[in-house]
């Protein structure tokens, strides 16, 4: 395979288009980049160097050493470099050195998804297995999939815990006295994929992190925070907003990558018209299925990113059908990966993707984050993912080091995607967006203040650092906080933890059960259940088709049975917005702009 392998793959899929179609609107080649290597710092424990050498890492890259050295010196740092640039080494070096040298030292790793946390845990176990200096590290997962026995082991024995913001909030912070030994020895806190923490989710995570650091100070530890981020605008400021403390940034990427070919692809018009006679293009899911099938048939390891769980299932199913027409054995080389699968099913798919047992997968943004899937040849992005940062994060999953790769953005039939493929500079030359959070939002801050006061009375310094004086005063007026000489105390009997909705989710989980066997297929958020598992709905799961028999919100169960209907179902959404008052209005030529009250019916 040559440096121009991405171009070869593009020529292949273009050759597979029907005669007369010219879907490629723009092609851009991103040049290859050579590695910038560094030497191992003198402070790194010799067994850590041995461990990395056994994994084939003989010379670290410059950004890894720069970030690791800042962390070892006790300075909070964010390393913001490209996908697959080895950011994990930047925190593994100081952590392993501390764990080997200090028996009481502890480390905490925080990931936004369980898949990423388990992937990093697997990587660490492979790295340190068989090395005596690390035999008492006992790295362990602590998340919603962990059994009670494993949770107790993590709390009492593990020196490096892999968790997520949700578990940190509901368990570690809530029951911090049971974690006192761990918190007292906490030397390093890793916040991986920190660019993911934006909006309300990021604001909640910021307050969780600041509550953690507040408790650590109470127990006498002052952990160094190491952030790992995709390339973003002003990563140091974003990391500062998460913990409320200054953060150094390392942004010069020393990792190598091969030439990457980016193609902007517009599906052709169909000989039909839509609403009001509007032209209609071939659906993005159909186009993405064909591209995935063509690439897998060529042997190119491919990820196709889609916008929805149903889209992942449909794209994988469509690709499998196309491949089966060529060679039935190829159909098993593609699968869907999405949220809602059982933990063991997710782990099996991750392993198959990592080892190459699966050649292609259709996925939601669940695989946008840094799960280690090395050696991908191509990425198909089925529809603009909403931000430039997400596009480059998904695109960055492609490319073996030193070899070319292909990225194809397939435009959906909507104005934004159409504009982007016809104006490539609006995507390819646009700066990556800044991460925006607001931990001082009173609706977010209020329940966190109650949790913090439950954990440890709030001092005046705490109130000032959180910019929370007005919210605290309101909580005192409401009788939820009580002011005493020692600070602000939570009212007796108060349990505010359930009021914190970290991810802005919509209700609990509905289990999807096969009626004939009782087998659990997966789960769906109760807010999504009426649209996806209503009675009579066609439900897709891992390439199998089911019909929904019943949906019971009381028990949180949807019953389904295996079937092969010759139709599919989807939810229709009707929205009615009506202006109900005069408000403020101005005329701009033929257009009127107004700030007016409305009624919203959905």
Tell what function each PLM region has:
Residues 1-62:
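Helicase-associated low-complexity/disordered flanking segments
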Residues 97-117, 220-221:
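Conserved SF1/SF2 helicase motif Ia
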Residues 113-117, 292-322:
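Conserved strand-helix element at the start of the C-terminal RecA-like helicase core
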Residues 144-185:
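Conserved helix/coil segment N-terminal to the catalytic DExD/H
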Residues 196-254:
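Post-DEXD/H (motif II) to motif III coupling segment of the RecA-like Helicase ATP-binding lobe
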Residues 236, 240-241, 248-305:
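Conserved interdomain linker/interface between the two RecA-like ATPase lobes of SF2 helicase motors
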Residues 332, 339-341, 359, 365-406, ...:
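Conserved RecA-like helicase motor core of SF1/SF2 enzymes
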Residues 404-407, 413-428, 445-460, 474, ...:
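Extended Lys/Arg-rich polyanion-binding regions
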């Amino acid at each position: 395979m040559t440096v121009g392998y991405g171009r070869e793959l593009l020529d292949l899929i273009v050759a597979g288009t029907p005669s007369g179609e010219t879907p490629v609107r723009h092609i851009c080649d991103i040049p290859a980049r050579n590695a910038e290597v560094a030497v191992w710092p003198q402070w790194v424990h010799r067994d850590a160097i041995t461990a990395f050498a056994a994994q084939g890492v003989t010379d670290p890259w410059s950004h890894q050493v720069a970030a690791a050295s800042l962390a070892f010196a006790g300075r909070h740092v964010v390393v913001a470099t490209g996908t697959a640039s080895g950011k994990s080494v930047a925190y593994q070096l100081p952590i392993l050195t501390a764990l080997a040298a200090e028996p009481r030292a502890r480390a905490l790793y925080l990931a936004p998804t369980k898949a990423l946390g388990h992937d990093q845990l697997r990587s660490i176990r492979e790295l340190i297995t068989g090395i005596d200096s690390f035999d008492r590290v006992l790295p362990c997962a602590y998340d919603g999939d962990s059994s009670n026995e494993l949770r107790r082991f993590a709390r009492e024995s593990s020196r490096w815990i892999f968790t997520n913001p949700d578990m940190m909030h509901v368990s570690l912070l809530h029951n911090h006295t049971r974690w006192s030994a761990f918190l007292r020895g906490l030397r390093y806190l890793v916040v991986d994929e920190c660019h993911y923490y934006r909006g309300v989710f990021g604001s909640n995570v910021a307050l969780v992190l600041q509550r953690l650091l507040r408790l650590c100070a109470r127990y006498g530890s002052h952990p160094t925070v190491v952030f790992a981020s995709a390339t973003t605008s002003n990563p140091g400021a974003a990391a500062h907003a998460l913990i409320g403390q200054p953060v150094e940034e390392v942004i010069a990427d020393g990792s190598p990558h091969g030439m990457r070919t980016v193609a902007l692809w517009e599906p052709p018009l169909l000989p039909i018209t839509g609403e009001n006679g509007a032209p209609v293009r071939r659906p993005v899911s159909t186009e993405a299925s064909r591209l995935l099938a063509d690439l897998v048939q060529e042997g190119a390891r491919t990820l196709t990113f889609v916008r929805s769980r149903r889209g992942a299932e449909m794209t994988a199913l469509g690709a499998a059908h196309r491949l089966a027409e060529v060679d039935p054995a190829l159909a098993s080389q593609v699968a869907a990966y999405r949220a809602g699968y059982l933990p063991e099913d997710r782990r099996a798919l991750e392993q198959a993707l990592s080892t190459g047992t699966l050649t292609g997968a259709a996925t939601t943004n669940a695989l946008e984050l840094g799960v280690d899937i090395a050696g991908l040849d191509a990425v198909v992005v089925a529809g603009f993912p909403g931000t430039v940062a997400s596009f480059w994060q998904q695109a960055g999953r492609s490319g073996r080091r030193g070899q070319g790769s292909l990225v194809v953005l397939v435009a959906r039939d909507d104005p934004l995607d159409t504009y982007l493929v016809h104006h490539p500079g609006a995507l390819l030359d646009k700066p990556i967006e800044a991460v925006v959070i607001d931990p001082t939002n009173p609706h977010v801050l209020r329940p966190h203040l109650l949790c913090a006061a439950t954990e440890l009375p709030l001092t005046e310094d705490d109130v000032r650092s959180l910019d929370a004086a007005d919210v605290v005063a309101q909580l005192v007026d409401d009788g939820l906080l009580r002011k005493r000489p020692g600070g602000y105390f939570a009212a007796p009997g108060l349990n505010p933890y359930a009021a914190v909705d970290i991810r802005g989710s919509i209700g609990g989980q509905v289990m999807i059960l096969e009626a004939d066997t009782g087998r659990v297929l997966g789960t769906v958020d109760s807010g999504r259940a009426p649209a996806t598992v209503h009675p009579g709905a066609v439900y897709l799961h891992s390439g199998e088709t089911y019909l929904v028999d019943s949906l019971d919100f009381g028990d949180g169960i949807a019953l389904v049975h295996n079937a092969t209907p010759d139709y599919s179902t989807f939810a229709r959404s009707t929205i009615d917005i009506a202006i109900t008052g005069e408000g403020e209005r101005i005329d701009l030529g033929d257009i009127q702009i107004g700030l007016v009250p409305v009624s919203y019916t959905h």
